[in-house]
Amino acid sequence: MGSTSTPPHVLIIGAGITGLALAQALRKHGVSFAVYERDPDPLHRGKGWGLTIHWSLDAFLRLLPQHLIDRLPETYVDPDAVAKGENGNFLLFDLRTGETKWKVPPAKRLRVSRERLRRLLMDGIDVQWNKTISSISQISETAVRCEFSDNSSAEGTLLVGCDGSRSKTRSLLCSLAGNETPVRSENYQLPVRLIGVSAALPSRIALKMRALDPFFLQAGDPATSNFFWFSFLDTPINNDREDRDTYECQILISWPYRKDGSNNIEIPCHNVDKIKLMHSLADGWVEPFCEVVQSIPEETEPKIISLEDWPTPPKGSWSNLGGTATLVGDSAHAMTMFRGEAGNHGILDVSNLLEALIPVLTSSPHSPAKTQEEVINEYEDEMTTRTRPAVLRSRKACLDAHDYPSITADSPLVARRGAFEDDDLEYLLN
C-alpha cells in the first residue's frame, strides 16, 4: 500500500538551501510540512557567500513554483552578465606569473548570492527558529517523533535531516542504527587552513578581476602551494551600500598544514592579525591578485573555514527508522568547496527523493504505489552510491589545490563537474 490513514506531514530539520528547496517543493505539491532551524534568526550566520548551481540547475527549477523561478534574478551575483549570456570561464591561474593554467570545462550555470537565494526560498515558509534537535524516535510504523533542546517536540510521517555538514540529525540516526561497530558521525578535517573575507572593493580594482572572469576564478602559488579563490557577490547595479561604485567580493586564501610540518602557518587570534596574514601570504604574487588581497581593509572581519568532509558510508550506516527518517545534502555527504558540488548534490537529493516520494504521499490507501519505506531505501541506495565518490573527488581536489605539482589535467580540481562514479579514490581514506 502506498500510504496509511495517517495524513502525511514532513518534519524538515534545517532551513538552509536544501531544506528550504524541499519545503517549497512539498508546498508546490500540497504536502503538509514544518521547518525547524537551530539558528535564532535568519541573519545569525551573516550574509554568506556565493553559490554556483550548475549540473543540478534543471532539477532545481523543477522543485520551485513558477513565481519563485520568475524571481530568481533577484539572487544573481551579476544580473547584467546573466542577461548577456555570460557563463564565465572558471580559470585557474599561476599566482607568480599570471599565466592561465587550466580551464574547468564550461557548463550552463547560475552564480547566486547564497543569502539572497535563501531569503527567496523562505518566501511563504514559516520557519521555526531556535530549534535544536536532541532526539529522534519512531513511534509507530508510519510516524516519527523528534524532541528539541527547548523541551518542545514534533511528530510527523517523515523526518528529513537537512541540518548541514555538522548534522545533529546524522549523529542521532547513526547512533540508532544498531551496528556492532557504530559509524563515526564526526567529520574528517583536511590538512589545510583557510581564511576568507567578504570585502567591498572599488571599481578600479574589481574591474581588473572582472576582465579575467565576470563571476569567479581560482589560482595556485607554485612557490608555496598556497591557494587563492575570488568571486563576485554583487555589482554596482545591485548593491545598497553608501558607496555604490563598489563590488562586494569573496576572497579566500588557504594553505597546506601538515601534521609533522615545522613551518606550519598558524591562524592568529585577532582579526586585524588575520588580515595582515592574508596580506603577507600574497607577497610575490603578480597583479591584479596581489593588489586585490593588499586592498582588503584591516578592519574587515575575516571568517575561518574548517575544511572538513564526511564520505557517505554504506547504506545502513544510519537508521532510517523503517522509512520514517532520512538525510539529504551536507547532512549525508559533507564535502569541501573545491569542486563547488555540495549544493548541487543536495539539490539532486531533494529532487530524487521528491520524485519517488510524492506519489506515495499523495496516493490513496488502496493505490499500488510503493511503500514509503521502499522509497526511502531506494533513495538512500542511489544517494550513497552517487555521493561517496563525490566527497572523495572534492577531498582530492582540495589536496591537489595545496600541492601545486598535483594540479594536472586529471585532477578533480579542474576536471569536469557532474554526478558520476568513474574513479576510485578510496585510498584517500587510508
UniProtKB/Swiss-Prot annotation:
FAD binds at residues 9-37, 307-330. Its cofactor is FAD. It comes from the Eukaryota. Glycans are attached at N130, N151. One of its GO terms (molecular function) is FAD binding. It is an enzyme of class 1 (oxidoreductase). Its EC number is 1.-.-.-. Residues 1-23 form the signal peptide. Keywords: FAD, Flavoprotein, Glycoprotein, Monooxygenase, Oxidoreductase, Signal. InterPro entries: FAD-bd, FAD/NAD-bd_sf. It holds the Pfam family FAD_binding_3. This is Probable FAD-dependent monooxygenase.
